[in-house]
């Protein structure tokens, strides 16, 4: 068809990883781009997930946030790596490395928010940390519930168990964070920033979920368009499951930043931090002693903080 456009192969292409052993094989056709990567788009799009997790962890460390946020970043990074290996090989062992870390990574924000909700209910606006023993107890209960569900999933290989548990965790995190923001965040700017970051995170995540559903239910349509109209390499852009990775990777970043901001507010240490929007759209919670290295605003799509941008230019 041309140097920069070529047809999909007519028959299945063998790959270096051998026979597929995973219980799920997504709509993307296998080994059509490289014999080393079973699902090209579904693999490479995990780079968004991995990079956002790395930056989340780095930012939490550099800005002196609690270790729980380092664990959250590490957990989601592990999900990205597991998903990369799964889509690259379509092996069952890597499928588990993709799916199980999803629910275990969600345990950390679930545990954190349950503890925060208890702190808020007991102390009102004078927040004190839940005693360490109670934090451990809550974590053990959540961990046991997830471990039990994981064992059942591995035994019965019923993907509904994994998906239902993951959905329940998302609802708990979103509902608890929203309730805490509504009831206990009084500063108007902080509340606007929390709502904006949570809303964008939710919109991105839901958009990713829609892409995930479209990949499952309209696979034959996507295959037809890719083969008959787009061909390669443009066809790799029309992989809805790959867009699930991109959109959820971005959405989770937005939501983690909002959870960080909510946490410092409930601990009454928000005076030590500043919530900024890099280039007016990417949120980050930074230590007040730090000077942002990019232009930023204090609200979503708000005006740039000009005096800071001048300082940054002088430093350069």
Curated annotation (Swiss-Prot):
Its EC number is 3.5.1.-. Keywords: Disulfide bond, Endoplasmic reticulum, Hydrolase, Membrane, Transmembrane, Transmembrane helix. The chain crosses the membrane at residues 94-114, 136-156, 229-249. One of its GO terms (biological process) is ceramide biosynthetic process. The keyword Transmembrane applies. Pfam families: Ceramidase. Residues 37-57, 69-89, 161-181, 196-216 dip into the membrane without crossing it. Its main location: endoplasmic reticulum. It is a multi-pass membrane protein. GO terms for cellular component: cortical endoplasmic reticulum; endoplasmic reticulum; endoplasmic reticulum membrane. GO terms for molecular function: N-acylsphingosine amidohydrolase activity; sphingosine N-acyltransferase activity. Disulfide bonds join 27-219. Residues 1-36, 58-68, 90-93, 157-160, 182-195, 217-228 are lumenal. It is an enzyme of class 3 (hydrolase). It is found in: Endoplasmic reticulum membrane. Residues 115-135, 250-316 are cytoplasmic. It catalyses: N-hexanoyl-sphinganine + H2O = hexanoate + sphinganine; sphinganine + hexadecanoate = N-hexadecanoylsphinganine + H2O; N-hexadecanoyl-(4R)-hydroxysphinganine + H2O = (4R)-hydroxysphinganine + hexadecanoate; N-hexadecanoylsphing-4-enine + H2O = sphing-4-enine + hexadecanoate. Alkaline ceramidase that hydrolyzes phytoceramide and also dihydroceramide into phytosphingosine or dihydrosphingosine. Prefers phytoceramide. Also has reverse activity as acyl-CoA-independent ceramide synthase, catalyzing synthesis of phytoceramide and dihydroceramide from palmitic acid and phytosphingosine or dihydrosphingosine. Is not responsible for the breakdown of unsaturated ceramide. Belongs to the alkaline ceramidase family. This is Alkaline ceramidase YPC1. The lineage of its organism: Eukaryota, Fungi, Dikarya, Ascomycota, Saccharomycotina. The gene is YPC1.
